């Protein structure tokens, strides 16, 4: 009976919503165009993968999967990927929690330093840690050869090497998630437990940790998804420990088996979708937020000398390891030829800005085109989802956020299947790379915009509408200026992801348009580690310059407000 009433109520409302749309042609056109874009560049590529995998001679069939799974060299990568994902997610979450707890709950110095250290991996190429691992612990490594004279053999290729580099790469996601969780816990609850005679250790075990449990689960699922999707690190360090993302790539590129590669992509997609659904629709419903206004009490601090100095020492060691890895890349970029001639030189940078300039130029051009388009489109979708009522609104939101769950390898395969044949042939052009950049990380901008709009009183925009302005005018003149920080945070995040992309774009790059991350991968494969290091340093420098420029624009337009780039990354957990 209740369902029937809801259906009747919806049918009564729907015509009114549709009539409102027809009164605003620009709004109607905008909704149609957004849905067309989402279908073409998110839904269609995924559909093409499923179509190729489940269709044999025009008939539905599981034959491709039977064939793929009958080969041991395809089953092993699936098991390896799941094992690695579980291990990386647990270890990353432990380290992320230590940093987050130290910054929010422990009375230690250098909190800002530890916070910056924990977020630095976000702006670095995801496979930079693998490069550093080779420079440090490879056969010609700084530690293994120069210090230990090869007395100890470090097994950096395989499971343990990947575990270390992926943990150091992705623990920042866990840190940002758990930092927000711990900040949201009302300190009055912890103070009340202390007043009742509980020790600070007891408060941690009985109050803080249980309230943070959903956030911990969310962090584990997020890092698990990132580990499954990782492509660059396994390409460099996997050795004989093959994983699914690289196996799908090698199946297509090396064996020319498109059907087999598509089937492997679906096997990679399934656990990612499960993790996404658990994180979004189960964990996120378990509330850990206890602050509903400004806390009336100060947050307790762990100040016991043993606890304080133990956590401080642990954070210091972890920060030292992180800086050692990144510092080694900078040092390696100044070495003439790693492993043969360790004299210092700047010739690698000369090579980067001469022979490698085409890679830099193409990356900057494509990223600079994609970033503002992605930012504006994300804000439009957020505006439509939060402020407008129309049929299919929830579906639009779901599709726009779908790329959260889809690994880059799956997206790349989908794009070459969807846009390598009429009516839309884009392979080999700059357009396919730009479109992939736009829609690959669109979800972060949409989520950032939605979060910001939900904090703004809609009466401000309603006043504009009451004065005769249509939706497009209200969006340009009222909404967009109000969400400037979210807009620029989305721009910053998108630009960083464009500059460091590898897993999806490796399928669509061509001789005419290439990317700096492809150049780094090629240099590593050719054992030219010094040039790879120089390219990596240049990426970070350009990213930092871009972030400074975006912050400068915010200062000019937004009255000195700071962009929250880390917030865009952290919103993936919500």
Model-based region annotation:
Residues 231-255, 340-341, 502-529, 562-570:
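Glycine-rich helix-loop "coupling/hinge" segments at transmembrane-helix boundaries
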Residues 246-271:
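Helix-loop-helix hairpin linking two adjacent transmembrane segments in secondary transporters
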Residues 191, 199, 286-302, 338-352, ...:
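Juxtamembrane inter-helical linkers in multi-pass membrane proteins
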Residues 1-33, 280-316, 551-574:
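Transmembrane alpha-helical segments of polytopic membrane transport and secretion proteins
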Residues 7-11, 53-63, 136-149, 237-245, ...:
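Peri-membrane helix termini and adjoining interfacial loops of integral membrane proteins
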Residues 23-58, 70-183, 209-232, 263-280, ...:
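Membrane-water interface segments at the C-terminal ends of transmembrane alpha-helices
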Residues 14-19, 61-69, 344-353:
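A short amphipathic helical element positioned immediately N-terminal to and/or at the very start
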């Amino acid at each position: 009976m209740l369902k029937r009433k809801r259906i009747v109520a919806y049918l009564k409302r729907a015509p009114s919503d549709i009539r409102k749309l027809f009164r605003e042609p620009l709004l109607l056109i905008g909704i149609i165009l957004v849905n067309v874009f989402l279908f073409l560049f998110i839904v269609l590529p995924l559909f093409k993968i499923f179509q190729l995998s489940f269709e044999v001679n025009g008939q539905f069939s599981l034959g491709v999967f039977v064939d793929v799974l009958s080969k041991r060299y395809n089953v092993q990568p699936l098991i390896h990927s799941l094992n690695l994902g579980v291990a990386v997610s647990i270890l990353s979450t432990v380290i992320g929690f230590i940093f987050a707890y130290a910054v929010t709950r422990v009375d230690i110095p250098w909190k800002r330093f530890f916070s910056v250290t924990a977020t630095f991996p976000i702006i670095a190429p995801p496979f930079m840690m693998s490069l550093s691992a080779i420079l440090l612990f490879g056969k010609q490594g700084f530690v293994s050869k120069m210090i230990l004279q090869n007395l100890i053999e470090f097994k950096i290729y395989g499971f343990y090497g990947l575990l270390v580099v992926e943990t150091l790469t992705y623990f920042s996601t866990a840190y940002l998630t758990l930092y927000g969780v711990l900040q949201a816990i009302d300190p009055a609850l912890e103070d009340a437990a202390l007043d009742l005679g509980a020790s600070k250790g007891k408060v941690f075990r009985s109050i803080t940790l249980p309230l943070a449990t959903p956030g911990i689960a969310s962090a584990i699922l997020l890092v698990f998804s990132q580990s499954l999707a990782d492509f660059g690190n396994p390409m460099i360090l996997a050795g004989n420990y093959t994983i699914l993302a690289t196996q799908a790539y090698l199946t297509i590129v090396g064996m020319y088996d498109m059907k087999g590669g598509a089937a492997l992509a679906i096997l990679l997609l399934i656990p990612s979708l499960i993790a996404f659904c658990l994180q979004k629709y189960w964990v996120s419903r378990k509330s850990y937020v206890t602050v509903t206004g400004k806390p009336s009490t100060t947050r307790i601090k762990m100040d016991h000398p043993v606890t304080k100095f133990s956590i401080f020492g642990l954070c210091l060691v972890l920060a030292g390891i992180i800086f050692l890895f990144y510092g080694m890349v900078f040092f390696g970029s100044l070495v003439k030829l790693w492993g043969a001639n360790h004299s210092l030189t700047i010739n690698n940078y000369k090579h980067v800005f001469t022979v490698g300039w085409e890679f830099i130029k193409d990356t900057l051009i494509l990223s600079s085109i994609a970033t503002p388009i992605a930012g504006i489109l994300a804000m439009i979708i957020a505006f439509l989802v939060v402020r407008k009522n129309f049929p299919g609104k929830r579906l639009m939101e779901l599709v726009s956020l779908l790329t959260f769950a889809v690994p880059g390898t799956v997206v790349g395969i989908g794009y070459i299947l969807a846009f390598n044949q009429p009516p839309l042939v884009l392979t080999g052009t700059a357009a396919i790379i730009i479109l992939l950049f736009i829609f690959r990380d669109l979800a972060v901008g949409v989520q950032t915009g939605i979060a910001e709009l939900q904090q703004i009183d809609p009466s401000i925009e309603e006043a504009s509408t009451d004065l005769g302005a249509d939706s497009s005018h209200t969006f340009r003149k009222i909404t967009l200026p109000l969400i400037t920080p979210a807009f620029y945070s989305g721009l910053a995040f998108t630009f960083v992801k464009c500059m460091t992309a590898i897993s999806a774009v490796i399928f669509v790059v061509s001789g005419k348009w290439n990317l700096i991350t492809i150049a780094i991968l090629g240099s590593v494969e050719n054992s030219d580690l010094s040039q790879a290091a120089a390219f990596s340093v240049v990426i970070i420098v350009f990213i930092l310059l871009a972030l400074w420029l975006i912050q400068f624009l915010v200062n000019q337009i937004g009255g000195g407000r700071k962009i929250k780039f880390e917030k865009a990354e952290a919103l993936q957990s919500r």
